[in-house]
Amino acid sequence: MAQRTLKQQKEQKQDDLLNSAYHCFLNKGFAKTTIDDIVQRAQVAKGTFYLYFHDKEDIMKHLVIQISSQIVIRAYTQTQEQKITDFLPAVLFFIDTIIEYFKSNKDLLKLIERNFSWPLVVEYLSEGNQAEINAILEELLSYPQMRRLDQDEAFRILYMIVELVGSVCYSSIIEEQPASIDHLKPTLYRMVEKMLM
């Protein structure tokens, strides 16, 4: 068995710290988790933490970026698998996939709070995963309804949709305000439809 390269070892330590922080934040909450908790669970020295992250807020930001990106890519992949040819139904399916994911993963939604965010997804994807963001934007621009827009405007629309969905999911699923997500879906979908027309 080949030895892991130094780069692979560093990536593994960073992943171990992220996984440890994820579990600590879920179990104890962000406020009650200490850096000592994170490094103890990851079985690394405290100094190792600071090689990768500035502080607890920095590791949380990395977690939110990672989680948000995975959710968006998952929703995009599931939408692609449905082979929906009409624009609006495809966008609504994409949104519904995100909503249903959050409904099934309330603890995760509590963890990332209102930070499910398109800019964070873009930040993650720009770190070497640009293919996914380009595929999503190309797909969005391929619909006749979007051909009138340039890539920047399409990006802004996608940004607004993801921000809106993230905020509404947190308020309605976690806080049950102003109503349950199932009650709000029709209104949310009408808002998205207006944004896309």
Regions found by a protein language model. Give the residues of each.
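Hydrophobic/aromatic-rich alpha-helical bundle segments in the mid-to-C-terminal region
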Residues: 144-191
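Alpha-helical DNA-contacting segments of helix-turn-helix folds
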Residues: 53, 60-70, 74, 112, ...
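Short hydrophobic/aromatic patch on the recognition helix
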Residues: 43-53
